[in-house]
């Protein structure tokens, strides 16, 4: 089944509200095997909404609208759909009573315009709204299905789950599933080049996407529930054979979660000493439940004096090489490891910008130190972007060094 979503509301076009409804609906409809080919945002304007409905009617079997079901004059979705389909609006006594009951529960009286929400195009299946005053409805006409939902997510989601999802499930026996592989250490163009033959497939499909400092490959398959996972697994296996060590996580997993799991599995502990990342490493680690079992200490030593007094970085090192140097990164990692009595020590020092750079040490220069029981590694990074981007990428590189070590892989 081909479907599309029309989101109604001038506030969406002005950027005052983020359209989370379209994301939620697309994800849920994919589980039903319904292909959503188009998302449209349109303001509270009858003529423009009619144009959108006309286009959708010609190309889609399922048309879902969100928003525009309120009691005010600019809430015109129902009226516009009724006019577009040449259907009269009919009052529902049941919906009207529900509106009265809703206001009684909150100790108020409905105004006359509230009862506008009890009007529906003739032939509609009315969807009760337990969380507001705007019922939705489903309408089938000439082989097309219209699903009309309120805009607030707190009303839309329960209505969809309780009424719309079971209703649409009757029309399909397929599902659409996806798996996302997260890749670090390779750029998008390189990833695409390495897996290019797999990008040509139609089912499953493989699509590269750029994240904040990493690349993802989304594998999507459509078919019977029992078939799609096998289809995805076969393609994933081929991708892992090509990219192997660069794949660090699947779906919603984050780099820090993987690091914590590996530390727990190996029985290792970690301590961090940060300068340019300003506590970002420690923050990300402690966001993960159970981190206290493997994370001993996190310190932010921003000044040279703090590096010297707290971490014991030698004054001669700072004088000779400066705070942003491989020598300082090395001592920071080694010394925090000893200070915390941890198995591993991780450090960052660099210039995140926008100021502070020089021709010899430009903005984006970062050194990551990683001390292990066997040896200490120092990685030089030349990063681009704004301050947050440089800090985030420094964090990912640091955690990736830990991941590689714990997985027994080569540390670049």
Swiss-Prot record:
Database matches in CDD domains: cinA
Gene3D superfamilies for this protein: 3.30.70.2860, CinA-like, MoaB/Mog-like domain
Region forming the signal peptide: none
Pfam families recorded: CinA, CinA_KH, MoCF_biosynth
InterPro entries to which the protein is assigned, alphabetical: CinA, CinA-like_C, CinA_C, CinA_KH, Competence-induced_CinA, MoaB/Mog-like_dom_sf, MoaB/Mog_dom
SUPFAM superfamilies noted in UniProt: CinA-like, Molybdenum cofactor biosynthesis proteins
Taxonomic superkingdom: Bacteria
Family, similarity comment: Belongs to the CinA family.
HAMAP family: CinA_B (MF_00226_B)
PANTHER family per the UniProt record, alphabetical: NICOTINAMIDE-NUCLEOTIDE AMIDOHYDROLASE PNCC (PTHR13939), NMN AMIDOHYDROLASE-LIKE PROTEIN YFAY (PTHR13939:SF0)
Protein name, entry field: Putative competence-damage inducible protein
